């Protein structure tokens, strides 16, 4: 214990963030033992008044005593870290689950809570959690369970979205007026639908689409009832011009 590097010894002047990083890497018991040893070694030394130094060490030890190790059902990032994108997530989940993902619940590694899709062997062991440096080193090698559990959720979400019909689309567009980015996406969809309509029906005279994403984000307009000012929709005999943000769609119609 006394041969530990200098960076592994608790320092009451380093702040709470440094103490929590040390607790994440070394564990509560080891940090408290080292704090008591260092506190005993420097009693009566240093430029600080003894009462102030004692108060700092006591605050450090109380913080360490109240710390609890983070316990998560699974580790890892998300499905994209493993290269799973889009609908391929649903295709990759079932064969991987059937292949035996319980290997991810190995002792000393990633553990799964009982009742999870991957099975489980109970809560983690008493081994201290990995340090943040180790987690950054392992970020490009996520565990199978940590990657495929969120992938399962993404696949279920895709399936529900694909099988929900128009109701899901209507609910999604109901909140577009609160999200400028969603309005821009709706305008892009509007332009694509109008382009497909012009190829199928002859009463569509033309389509002019010009968009700059910054201007579209700033100029997304709602219906006339939602704004105080001049309307953006103009209806003329024989044709209809609809302006919305950066898009202008011209239709022919009855007078």
Curated annotation (Swiss-Prot):
Region feature (Disordered): 112-145, 157-183
Highest rank taxon of the organism: Bacteria
Protein name: Uncharacterized 28 kDa protein in petA 5'region
